[in-house]
Amino acid sequence: MLHEARDRQKFVSDVQYLRDMQHKVDSEYQACLKRQEHKKEPNEKKQEQLWGKDTSDRSRFSSGSSCKQSSGEEDSLSEARLATKAPTAKCEPKLPAIDQTSVKQKHKGTMTLKKPEKVSPSKPSAVAQATKILSRKRRPNLGRLTVSPEMHSPRLSGERSRQKAQLSTKTSGLLGADPVVQQDSLLSANEMKLKRPAREKRNLAPSSQLVRVAGKAPLERQKKGDPSARPQNEPHTALSQTFQPMSGSQVLTESSVPPFLPATVVGPRRAPFRFHDEDFYSALSLNNEQENYDTEEETRTEEELLLAGMRSPPSYKRSRFLGTSAAQNRNVEENAENLRGNSLRRSEPNPGSPRKTSVTEPTTKQSSPGQRMLQDTRLPRELAKDNPSGDQDEKTPVPGDAKSDGVTQVSAEDVSNNCAVEDRSAVHNCERDWQRYLSGSRNSFDCLLSGRPTAPRASVNPSYNAHGSLFHSAVIDDIPASLSVSSILVPSAELEENLRFNVRRPLSPIRNRNPSAASESHSEDTQGEEERASTSQAQESPLLSDLPNPQSSMALGDSPSSPTRRHLQGHFYMPGSLQENIPFTFFAVSDFASQNDNGTSVRVSGVMDEKATEIKADPEKLRKLQESLLEEDSEEEGDLCRICQIAGGSPANPLLEPCGCVGSLQFVHQECLKKWLKVKITSGADLSTVKTCEMCKQGLLVDLDDFNMTEFYHKHQQSRAQSELMNSGLYLVLLLHLYEQRFAELMTLNYRRASRERMSRNYPQPRPEESESSESGDGNESNVYPGRVI
């Protein structure tokens, strides 16, 4: 008991000790966590201050001396700052405030930059907090978007920019004091400002938007004749010359950026396909909240600038397109200015579209038709990605003009045919170099340039050329962002056919498209392109007559006898840069898998018919085989014994028919029957049961020469009785022996009692002391003897 109590007490004390230790460890862990939080807070504050300082420096450098704002704009900025509040903000980054005006003010181009000197780093605004959170939430993975190693290593990009500064200086010198060049330099500076924070991997949204807005304000001042915009253009020109080799968007000079700005549509879009690249597609996902306008705009602008750098031709190909005449550029600018006012009138709110885009800037920076051709073929995905359905009506530039449909038609023709190429041999060399530049892709989109006519068509209707880039955004705005780029990069005459594959069925792009892969040689590609160019020129006017109405154009593309469909299937090429975009390459490769659907279906149908006939013939053969096997078994086996299952019999052991059973139970061997009857008799069955068949319940006709069933039964019964008698005698003998043993023991006990009584009678009674001693002795004897008896 003592040991058990001690063990129990020890166990209780151990449990208490363990509980105390656990409580102590938990308290120490909580204290450690609190200390870490206290240490982490000052570090985060320091880091946020550094980020805010760096971002404010960048915004101050990008804005320059001309980034001033009126008192009305400051009031609107303060109202927007109070309106937008991010409840989930945990940290307060010291970032410059972002002008967040209404959608109508964005259309009118009044969104400008607040002076960074007025932004105090100690008091961050709620707009900056919300913008930082949104930028972290919706930022794409820029490392996955980049193609050239210049995007990954800023040191290498800086060296290349210094090496190629002279080339960019010569290029800008060729154009002279053209205002379009200065606009281009502003946009190149914007690109540099967008890509500098890419090395820091975060906090890109506020500074990039500031740079974008800073670039828009001087442009509008320059259009209005404001002389203050001129001094700011000069430093930006120098910056663009330094940054030109790295950006990759200087390829087309002043026409490289206009599709970016109209493409920043903040309306709803379809949810794209999702692959392993979740960060990229999460940036393209739909967001209908009004306070996210600025973040969505600058995020898409950055993605478009990066994607523009992926598909840029080399610098010596640049110079060929830079050599267009200054007179053409001035003519295009004048027409663009005329169309700008009409576009502003068309950009008023319309119930057909949930949100409107700004069509102010793109019409002011259009260039030669050759440059516009490269621009549209290079950026179709960005335009398709950022233009939702329902915005087609606002892309028509002249609302009151009776030739508004013709504008779209002629602009489509300019997209396909206004390619300023001087000689095809030089273009072949450029194409081969560009293919080598884009990871050695053999069938790049440059083959489309080789077969186009060399005569530009800018003199036909120069006022319509300014809207060449808007054609794609007006026609393919229903295409989801996850579709292959190769499904969009088709020239004008095949555009309706491309809509047939993409617009009406956005959720099944692989099944509904059937383009053939370009497996011919390079010379065959160029010949096929020339044939297709001639055919498309002859069929442009009837095919493009209904393009402002997308449903009619899609119905036209659905006709199976359309010649453009045959040309599309015969000559369709993948751009080489698709190898660097895995999510897009998936769809592009799937096109190759579905290129031979017709022939494959014919062959598969023939094979299936043959297999079906074989399957029909197989049951007949199986049935015949089974019947033949059964016949052979019956012939070979013959009559079987139902006990031993052996066919046939012998004269010494013949087959008998003892009962009325039929079939496989009809016959039985003689020896087998004897053994079976003996077993039944020895098992204790009576004679009637032994003589009855177990199956048919009829009497057995047993007439065996050497076996008498009745005699065997009687003998067995006699032997059984004898064995029972012998067993009973043995039992009696055993009982007698037991009784004898017990009787002897009882006799011994009786003898001892008698002898003791006799001794007590013969001897007199002793004295009391002697009697006591004798009684003790008798008691000892009585104790001993009963032990013996027992």
UniProtKB/Swiss-Prot annotation:
User: Could you tell me the Gene Ontology terms of the biological process aspect for this record?
Assistant: protein ubiquitination
Q: Name one Pfam family in it.
A: RINGv
Show the ranges annotated as biased composition (Polar residues). 230-240, 355-370, 406-416, 511-520, 534-563
Q: Which reaction does it catalyse?
A: S-ubiquitinyl-[E2 ubiquitin-conjugating enzyme]-L-cysteine + [acceptor protein]-L-lysine = [E2 ubiquitin-conjugating enzyme]-L-cysteine + N(6)-ubiquitinyl-[acceptor protein]-L-lysine
Return the InterPro entries for the record.
Answer: RING-CH-type_E3_ubiq-ligase, Znf_RING-CH, Znf_RING/FYVE/PHD
Composition bias type Basic and acidic residues, residue spans:
34-48, 218-227, 521-533
Q: Which residues carry this modification: Phosphoserine?
A: S78
- Molecular function via GO: transferase activity; zinc ion binding
Which EC number(s) does UniProt give? 2.3.2.27
Spans annotated as Disordered? 33-240, 323-416, 507-569, 757-790
Where does the chain bind Zn(2+) 2? C659, C661, C693, C696
Pathway per the UniProt entry = Protein modification; protein ubiquitination
Task: Kindly list any coiled-coil regions of this protein.
Answer: 284-308
Top-rank taxon, per record: Eukaryota
PROSITE patterns registered for this protein in UniProt: ZF_RING_CH
- Where in the sequence does UniProt note compositional bias of the Low complexity kind? 61-70, 774-783
Residue positions annotated to bind Zn(2+) 1 are C641, C644, H669, C672
The transmembrane segments are none
Specify the residue ranges making up the RING-CH-type zinc fingers.
633-703
Keywords assigned by UniProt? Coiled coil, Metal-binding, Phosphoprotein, Transferase, Ubl conjugation pathway, Zinc, Zinc-finger
User: Matching PANTHER family, A to Z?
Assistant: E3 UBIQUITIN-PROTEIN LIGASE MARCHF10-RELATED, MARCH7/10 E3 UBIQUITIN PROTEIN LIGASE FAMILY MEMBER
Question: What is said about the domains?
Answer: The RING-CH-type zinc finger domain is required for E3 ligase activity.
According to its UniProt entry, what is the function of this protein? E3 ubiquitin-protein ligase. E3 ubiquitin ligases accept ubiquitin from an E2 ubiquitin-conjugating enzyme in the form of a thioester and then directly transfer the ubiquitin to targeted substrates.
The name under which this protein is listed is Probable E3 ubiquitin-protein ligase MARCHF10
Q: Which organism is it from?
A: Rattus norvegicus
**Species lineage:** Eukaryota, Metazoa, Chordata, Craniata, Vertebrata
